[in-house]
């Protein structure tokens, strides 16, 4: 597969270059020259395969590897991602079932499998791995049904949202993508008001993953939906600290299938004990943020299609914080996990 950058679509490079570099010579982020398309028949075939086989097929597509589902299973286990069902067709996609209790362990192992030499924020390999994992989740048609599936995630560096948007372009049944922000709500301001402060200072919260003011993969979104010229305008605002404004047409374009929600830290602290009381399910602060953002989206739009919420680490990783919120000793909390 050939790749170009978000700042130059004329000079293409090969897969080998993308595996060892996170950015091109122009400083742009790598993107495929052309995203492949999956037909309904091809998607049906994938839905009949295991999670590992789905992941292998997507990785082979982007990196010209010759992986099998067995290779992936041996690398990350047969069930590295599990779906926990809550009420109203909401599934918590736990991507952390490994010895570290974090998605980063799964990502590291898969990077080694495709011989990637970089794990820097913003590199294409990280995005492609997210796409592969999401494709594997969507392959569980017996669980998720046959229609489109909404995807909710903490906005963070925008890796999960851009991965879901790319998969939708490829023909996968991705519905709306819900980007969940906390008090660091610059992305919400962009989608809701068409403007983004590039000189904002981050606020430290109980969800560090969301404490991002300028998501690195936002450049991929602007490039894919607005082109190179729009990226240059955005970068100039970043260089000067000016506010970036979207044109009306660009704003309407971005709003198609993309929703942003703001959830305060206080609400996260309320959601964790409430969800446990209602569903006997313990959430990490990040999962509670994404779950609450999904509920906001549903309340505003009235849409109640099947949805998955990305959960990238176990509550075990935030045991002291979650225990404090639930007013439990850490030892008692761990008995609930």
Regions found by a protein language model. Name each.
Residues 1-337:
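PLP-dependent amino-acid enzyme catalytic core
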């Amino acid at each position: 597969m050939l790749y170009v950058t978000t700042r130059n679509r004329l000079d293409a490079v090969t897969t080998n270059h993308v595996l060892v570099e996170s950015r091109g010579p122009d400083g742009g982020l790598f993107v495929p020259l052309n995203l492949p398309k999956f037909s309904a028949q091809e998607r049906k075939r994938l839905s009949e395969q295991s999670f590992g086989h789905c992941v292998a097929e997507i990785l082979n597509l982007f990196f010209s590897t010759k992986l099998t589902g067995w290779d992936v299973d041996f690398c990350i286990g047969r069930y590295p991602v599990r779906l926990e069902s809550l009420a109203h067709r909401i599934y918590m996609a736990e991507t952390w079932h490994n010895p570290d209790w974090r998605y980063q362990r799964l990502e590291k192992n898969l990077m080694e499998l495709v011989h990637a030499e970089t794990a820097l924020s913003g590199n294409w390999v990280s995005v492609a791995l997210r796409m592969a994992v999401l494709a594997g989740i969507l392959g569980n048609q017996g669980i998720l049904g046959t229609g489109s599936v909404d995807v909710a995630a903490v906005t963070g560096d925008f890796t999960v949202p851009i991965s879901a948007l790319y998969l939708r372009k490829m023909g996968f049944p991705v519905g709306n993508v819900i980007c969940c922000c906390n008090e660091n709500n610059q992305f919400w301001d962009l989608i809701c008001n068409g403007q983004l402060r590039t000189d904002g200072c981050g606020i430290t919260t109980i969800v560090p993953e969301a404490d991002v003011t300028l998501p690195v993969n936002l450049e991929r979104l602007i490039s894919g939906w607005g082109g190179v010229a729009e990226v240059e305008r955005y970068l100039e605002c970043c260089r000067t600290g000016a506010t970036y404004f979207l044109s009306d047409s660009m704003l309407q374009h971005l709003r198609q299938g993309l929703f942003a929600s703001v959830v305060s830290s206080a609400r996260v602290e309320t959601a964790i004990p409430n969800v446990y009381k209602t569903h006997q399910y313990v959430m990490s602060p990040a999962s509670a943020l994404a779950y609450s953002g999904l509920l906001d989206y549903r309340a505003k739009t009235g849409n109640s299609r099947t949805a998955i919420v990305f959960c990238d680490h176990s509550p075990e990783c935030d045991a002291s914080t979650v225990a404090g919120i639930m007013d439990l000793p850490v030892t008692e909390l761990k008995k609930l996990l």
